[in-house]
Amino acid sequence: MIDWTTKKAPAWFEHNVPKHYPLPRLSDADMIQMVTDIEEVRDLMSLRSYYQAADLRQKELDELWVSEPIHAAKASYGSNYGYYYGKSEVQRWYVDEFQAKRKAQLKTYCEKQGVPEDEKLLGAGCMYMCPLSTSIVRIAKDGQSAKGIWYSIGQQSDLKEDGTASGLWMYLKICADFVKEDGKFKLYHIVVANDQNYQAGTKYDADTYIDPKDDALAVEFGNPTIPMNVHDNTYNWADNYPPMPEPYDTLTPENSYGPEGHPMLKGGKGV
């Protein structure tokens, strides 16, 4: 907690206090390029939200993520519970396991409704939407990468095995790295850090601690390549990871949102 008598906060809290950085002094041409790059990154992340909402995860991975082997090998998807490391690992969990879940839900839905199984009904009873807000995007000084943070108050509705529905509210801090491939920014690393989540119908004065085995988001994240405590939501948004992006010269593993940039793994320990 902050000691309000001295206005002194512990170091971990100070690390994530928002800071203002004035725009750099640039030529007109460089300023136009920087603003164009920022809007390109914002558009990419907005499109990703709509692809997710429409269950177009394979399309997202094919169109919006890195594809060059040097980048694909170190692409990552992180959450509170660890990282999927390497694009093939992201594919395995984010696309393949998700599609298997949707097919199982389709079978349940059709059995409960007494209708023939039809893939046109894939996703019936399910909904996922995480709109993005309050973006901060930094373009590297070398122009070859970008970093961004967004906040999302999202919701997820799923069909359970017994045919009943479950609903979830999610409060998320989303951070990502982007690199240029063929002159276009592509998603390289993403961390979806959950600050809070509540099952629909939960009383707002109820105990907010969720045992990991009962945490729908932890269960859904499966078995990541690197299991670890990436973001401790005991402190909600004030946890110092993932930090807000600051101005930087060039993207390195150590300053990235990939596992190599996490304070516990900095320098490649365990990666």
Predicted region positions:
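Low-complexity, intrinsically disordered terminal/linker segments enriched in charged
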Residues: 160-170, 181, 191-271
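Short, low-complexity N-terminal intrinsically disordered segments enriched in polar/charged residues
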Residues: 1-59, 63-67
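Short beta-strand segments enriched in hydrophobic/aromatic residues
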Residues: 52, 65, 152-154, 191-194
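Short acidic, glycine/proline-rich loop/turn micro-motifs
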Residues: 74-76, 158-163
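Active-site rim elements
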Residues: 34, 124, 162-166
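Short beta-strand edge/turn micro-motifs at domain boundaries
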Residues: 2-19, 145-149, 171-202
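Short, surface-exposed coil-to-beta transition loops
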Residues: 130-132, 168-174
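A solvent-exposed, acidic/Ser-Thr-rich amphipathic alpha-helical stretch
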Residues: 58-154
